[in-house]
Regions:
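Short, charged/polar micro-motifs that form catalytic or ligand-binding hotspots
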Residues: 8-20, 42, 46, 157-161
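Conserved helicase/translocase P-loop NTPase motor core
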Residues: 1, 150-154, 163-167
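A generic structural motif
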Residues: 35-49, 160-167
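A short acidic-Thr-Gly-centered motif at the start of a beta-strand
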Residues: 1-9, 121-123
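A short acidic (Asp/Glu
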Residues: 3, 22-27, 142-145
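Beta-strand elements within well-structured catalytic alpha/beta cores of enzymes
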Residues: 7-26, 56, 130-134, 168
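His/Asp/Glu-rich, glycine-adjacent segments
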Residues: 32, 45-158
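N-terminal extension/subdomain marker
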Residues: 25, 32-37
Length: 168
């Protein structure tokens, strides 16, 4: 937690199912507000949300989560949602490192919750860490295969990137 240890307030924004080519498509929209320090990393496989997001938030590999926190791990065969324990997983990581950070966790999956979140941003500034998961790109990705209208709007990779840019 180097930034938090330095006293910085952090907004960790995770855009689910956001690809590198999509990032490159929208980066210039944010450039006037932010500076970027980019580094490429590799990911665990599979990159399925259940494994990747739970690992990011816990700071552990999936097998470690299952062993250390079985009450927070949902098996692949289960009908239960696989990412319902993200906030508790963040808490476990903070506690494992013996930190006392204040944090909030928000998962945005529709425009109404997005508006609500924007309205409470001033109160979030009191937290040292704020985690925000944006699900639009993931929903768009799934709709691209399941919804004829979205399939027609995003017929090619370039069109898909353009649709992502429009959302931004």
């Amino acid at each position: 937690f180097p930034m938090l240890d330095n006293g910085d307030k952090v907004f960790f924004i995770l855009i689910d199912n956001f690809r590198l080519d999509q990032w490159r498509e929208v980066k210039d929209l944010l450039a006037e507000y932010y500076t970027f320090d980019e580094s490429l990393y590799y990911s665990i496989l599979p990159t399925a949300t259940q494994y990747a997001r739970n690992s990011i938030f816990s700071g552990l590999m999936p097998l470690q989560i299952e062993k250390m926190f079985p009450e927070l791990w949902v098996d692949e065969d289960s009908e239960e949602g696989k990412n319902l324990n993200e906030a508790p997983l963040i808490q476990t990581q903070i506690e494992r490192f013996r930190k006392k950070y204040t944090f909030s966790y928000h998962k945005v999956h529709d425009s109404q919750y997005n508006d609500k979140l924007l309205n409470i941003v001033p109160s979030l500034l009191h937290n040292q860490l704020n985690v925000v998961v944006l699900n639009f790109v993931d929903m768009l990705s799934h709709a691209r295969t399941e919804n004829k209208m979205i399939r027609e709007l995003a017929q090619s990779e370039a069109a898909y990137r353009s649709l992502t840019r429009s959302w931004f």
